[in-house]
Amino acid sequence: HARRLVTTSPVLSYTKLQSLLNNPYFKVKEFDLVFDSDISLEAALDILKAEVVSAVKKGNSIIHLVEEMPDENYLSINSLLAVGAVHQELVSLGLRSDANIVTTSSSARDTHQIACLIGFGATAVYPTLAYQTILDLSMRKELKGSAHENCARYRKGINKGLLKIISKMGISTISSYRGSQLFEIVGLGDDIVQKCFTNTTSRIKGKSFQDLDVELRSLDEYARSNLADINVGGLLKYIHGGEYHAYNPEIVKKLQEAVSSGSEAVYRQYAELVDNRAPAMLRDLLVLKKIQHPQDIKAVEPVKKILKRFDSAGMSLGALSPKAHETLAEAMNHLGARSNSGEGGEDQERFYKDRMAIGKT
């Protein structure tokens, strides 16, 4: 019978990682994702792929990709790029079933990032920077409980998040999700997609390897600079001068002002803020083409008939507040379009009134 290693989760603890790497029955080959800054990111990936293929052909069944802080004059390949490139190379050569890809990742911290690693080929993930952060916070008493307990809670949360992600795709086991590539890429060019995420949809294209190389070097320079404060960035919470948020305080405040005052002039100011912002969503890139010879307005359907084909998405009471739920229904009724009550329907007091949703789910 074949010898097998069984783990209860693709997110490894330190003990599980060491047990896996030091198992006498499996040959392990470790690859540091650090490369000399004199070569390009794309060249470093090509070297990594060749070395991994050679190791697998020599019988190494566990490939350990390690992403950690590099020394000066060195850079590190992002673990997702590395996992994707290695996975695709092994698949193309018919070697993927001969090896498992385990990654010690500093860049993967939340459920989406870890799901991406697994979805693009990783067998298991050890999120080292997340654990180091939890250890530091526990030692400074900023988190209740011991470091061991907090790391266990973190893994439990990640596992729940992964189960939620895969279940939404109709998948019940992590082995079925591994390498499935059930993603759409936003903002990466064909050269990166072809090498690291082959056949994954990337509709609007975007950055090339050269762009990522420049960003990587800039980030390395910033990380080594003697700054008094670390830039938090504002990815999760809005910070002035940080990551742009579509619903930032200026826009939200103006919308609230327009709603409370009922002033069309204030609403126009809100609309102008939204329309003139830098692209933050795919819909911001949508532009209506102007034709040279407009169609005679009498030759097309009237607005009232066209509006009948519009509907608002079904959203249940609870997901929306009662006021918002009723306002949507009332607005769509006034337009002559269709609203949708969402799951659970609506209060019978709204029946046969302007606040009644036309569609019932």
Name these PLM-found stretches:
Residues L75-I101, R153-K160, K164:
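Alpha-helix-loop-beta-strand connector modules within alpha/beta enzyme cores
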Residues I47-E51, P70-Y74, V86, V102:
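Active-site-adjacent structural elements in folded domains
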Residues H1-A44, E51-A55, G59-I62, Q113-I114, ...:
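Flexible, glycine-rich loop/tail regions that form catalytic "lids" or insertion modules at the edges
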Residues L65-L81, Q348:
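Glycine-rich, proline-tolerant flexible connector loops at the mouths of alpha/beta enzymes
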Residues H87-E89, D98, Q132-E149:
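A compositional/structural signature marking long, glycine- and acidic/polar-rich segments
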